[in-house]
A protein has these predicted regions:
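Residues on the lipid-exposed face of transmembrane beta-strands in outer-membrane beta-barrel proteins
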Residues: 154-158, 191-195, 252-256, 308-314
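Acidic/polar loop-and-plug regions of large Gram-negative outer-membrane beta-barrel proteins
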Residues: 173-177, 187-257, 267-303
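Outer-membrane beta-barrel translocator/receptor signature
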Residues: 78, 91, 100-103, 114-191, ...
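Acidic, small-polar-rich N-terminal luminal/periplasmic segments of exported/outer-membrane proteins
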Residues: 1-135
Length: 322
């Protein structure tokens, strides 16, 4: 027997509590329970669970998240547009997102996504963070497969006192590949803190520190849509070393409830990221089907982003206008 999840959700993406049957837009919601049942470890793992959302070029074999909504591709130079707790998080350099500190995923489909700043015509993804709890909990997960892909993650949350609680999440991945000379490694650390200032006011602090490194791999070339080399063949240079991404993110959110109908939300986020490394990439396969032109690039990109947002949410009785 299956159970249907309550469709009335307090959505940080749509800014209000609603029943999905009563709003004029298409929204797919993946809860923590669904992600655990389907063993979702990365955003890519969740795409097969949502209609109209498809994986796209992830930049050299997985250096950032990228997908399309309803056939509309996202920015090829920055990856997919997404928000976290209602604020943009994917501007500039961004490492692939880990879901160890994600409570739920919201996929907003259609032009409504354009209401939230840098959006796409096809849609937008919102990441809802897990929050510190006032009951002590810990969780350890281990994962391995026959392709020498290993992952370990640890989560812990506990109260400090009646007003303060913290949460820590750590994850490490070491991934080999069926392709020659291709591998990747990632460290992820996320400390969070919640302060209940009063019954009506709460302050939340989230942070993420991601370091991702791996072989930049463009795949293999084809001639007339046919493979002309073994799919395992790496066409770059192993001596180039790894391409490395450092992605550090901080978000501070303040919420104050004036009464059951009116609420003030204010937030600020800061993001600092860097991508650096050499990579030799295939450029063009010549007509003989045997000669591959290549080019060697050095990337040293940095990005810094600051975002602030304040919202006043409330209910207004418009029955007089009916």
């Amino acid at each position: 027997e299956s159970t249907r999840e309550d469709v009335s959700q307090n959505s940080s993406a749509t800014k209000f509590t609603h029943d999905v049957l009563d709003v004029p837009f298409n929204r797919a919601y993946l809860s923590k329970q669904i992600m655990e049942q389907q063993d979702v470890q990365r955003i890519d793992d969740a795409l097969t669970l949502v209609s109209g959302v498809f994986h796209q070029n992830s930049f050299g074999g997985g250096f950032w998240d990228n997908y399309s909504f309803r056939g509309f591709s996202t920015d090829p130079n920055l990856g997919a547009a997404m928000i976290r707790n209602g604020l943009s998080v994917n501007r500039g350099i961004s490492a692939p997102k880990d879901v160890v500190n994600i409570e739920s995923l919201e996929f907003l489909k259609g032009p409504m996504a354009a209401l939230y700043g840098r959006g796409e015509t096809g849609g937008l993804l919102n990441l809802n963070s897990k929050k510190p709890q006032w009951e002590s909990e810990s969780e350890l997960n281990l994962r391995a497969n026959t392709q020498e892909q290993y992952r370990i993650s640890l989560e812990h949350t506990a109260p400090i006192n009646d007003e303060l609680a913290y949460r820590l999440a750590v994850a490490h991945e070491d991934n080999q590949s069926f392709r020659d000379h291709v591998s990747s490694e990632r460290w992820f650390f996320s400390p969070q803190l919640t302060w209940k200032i009063s019954d009506q006011t709460q302050l939340d602090f989230d942070s993420e520190f991601t370091e991702h490194k791996g072989t930049f791999d463009r795949g293999v070339s084809t001639v007339n849509h046919q493979f002309v080399m073994d799919p395992k063949t790496f066409t770059g240079e192993p001596d180039d070393g790894d391409l490395k991404i450092k992605d550090y993110f901080y978000q501070l959110r303040l919420s104050h409830e004036f009464n059951p109908d009116w609420k003030l939300n204010s937030a600020v986020s800061y993001k600092d990221a860097q991508m650096v490394g050499f990579a030799t990439e295939p450029r063009r396969m010549q007509a003989d089907g045997r000669t591959l032109e290549r080019q060697r690039r050095y990337r040293d990109y940095t990005s810094e982003d600051v975002l602030a947002q304040t919202e006043l949410l409330g209910k207004i009785d418009t029955s007089w206008a009916r």
